[in-house]
Amino acid sequence: MASVSAIGVLKVPPASTSNSTGKATEAVPTRTLSFSSSVTSSDDKISLKSTVSRLCKSVVRRNPIIVSPKAVSDSQNSQTCLDPDASSSVLGIILGGGAGTRLYPLTKKRAKPAVPLGANYRLIDIPVSNCLNSNISKIYVLTQFNSASLNRHLSRAYASNMGGYKNEGFVEVLAAQQSPENPNWFQGTADAVRQYLWLFEEHNVLEYLILAGDHLYRMDYEKFIQAHRETDADITVAALPMDEQRATAFGLMKIDEEGRIIEFAEKPKGEHLKAMKVDTTILGLDDQRAKEMPFIASMGIYVVSRDVMLDLLRNQFPGANDFGSEVIPGATSLGLRVQAYLYDGYWEDIGTIEAFYNANLGITKKPVPDFSFYDRSAPIYTQPRYLPPSKMLDADVTDSVIGEGCVIKNCKIHHSVVGLRSCISEGAIIEDSLLMGADYYETATEKSLLSAKGSVPIGIGKNSHIKRAIIDKNARIGDNVKIINSDNVQEAARETDGYFIKSGIVTVIKDALIPTGTVI
């Protein structure tokens, strides 16, 4: 996203919307600033920066009641009035989540944000990429469970001088730690941030951007932050429009005519659910879509002004552990300005095996996937691995995504996602499945030794059939194995046998061995 210093012409549009009293505010005449980036001196850039800031503040002063606009994730027509050096004024804080029990066994040996996604990526790449695409390059990731692989991935994927040495960008993991002042591990999202406030306040920023590490979506945080500043909010909560069917599974919010949050309800039902209906046209939906989506749910994504965050966590709610259920409703009760900001794009909370499975298979959807990794205007970044192209020999592959470095021989793959370095042998059938691949290749010598010992190499063996399953990394699936859940078992824990079944989806554990001839 271009900074102001890289834009040749900046137009500040007239503002003539009505305020809450019904009186039209004074229109601000359109002003155009023109300059050439190739000849603009350093002093001129500083002057331009301050001029843009004054113009933006002028618009806000004359228009005190501004409702945050509809946020469309792939919109190309936005113009923000953010500080050109946005990365220095916002600190990104990504919450890595707890033990990830609902995603077990995928979280058996890794933190939830480190779970592989979409053949080439990991979950953590989504919020980090959204930050980088929004010119936010100072990012912390808070975690306390199995953080080794997450730390390794981040150190390899994101350079220590992101954004250039001037911006001092970084992506750094902060693991839970005990100290004489606080002997406890993280007790929740708010407590995790509280324990590292001493570090966060060292950064001279205006806002903290609080993000979740297990969501799949593409969002322009610059628009989010712009709306926070324009409404003079203390806290801004990203909100997702909901229909009645889905609304009962989320924490809902009620807003007034200015988009200010006045009430919260956790997974309401019946009459309580009906009472949470809102006019979502206030936040930018058209009349038809507002009728279909009369509820707004919190996405667990917040912009919090720096001083407000410090006061809430240290003074107002020193014992609160969670943002969504304690701190944010508490801030509303104190009379702070807590605004809703509508995000009307694809969003998925990847907190369960079923949600994770559906999100991955969703990228194979025709003609347009639920989430696209092919948007060059807002790319998803990850670790460069320098793997060779995938090799497919007499393979029949349809409606699938194949990662880098795979070797696929004379097999059938349909509606599946195949991860890095996957090896699939002759006669295998892969349907409606997610294969995470492998961390390394085995040599021919190693495979011969395994065969001599009666063991199985990494990958999918000959004539094996995999259907509606997740195969974690480095799994060894023997020949003539059937993982098809023909009995339609919904829940089963067979950890000693190398697999679990959740919501009818078979998940083979990382590094597991499924012997030749096994039927699941």
UniProtKB/Swiss-Prot annotation:
Activity regulation: Activated by 3'phosphoglycerate, inhibited by orthophosphate. Allosteric regulation.
Distribution of this protein across tissues and organs: Leaves.
The pathway it acts in is:
Glycan biosynthesis; starch biosynthesis
Question: InterPro entries attached here?
Answer: ADP-Glc_PPase, ADP_Glu_pyroP_CS, NTP_transferase_dom, Nucleotide-diphossugar_trans, Trimer_LpxA-like_sf
- Quote the catalytic activity from the record: alpha-D-glucose 1-phosphate + ATP + H(+) = ADP-alpha-D-glucose + diphosphate
Q: Which family does it belong to?
A: Belongs to the bacterial/plant glucose-1-phosphate adenylyltransferase family.
Subunit description: Heterotetramer.
Specify the protein name: Glucose-1-phosphate adenylyltransferase small subunit, chloroplastic
Which source organism does the UniProt entry give? Arabidopsis thaliana
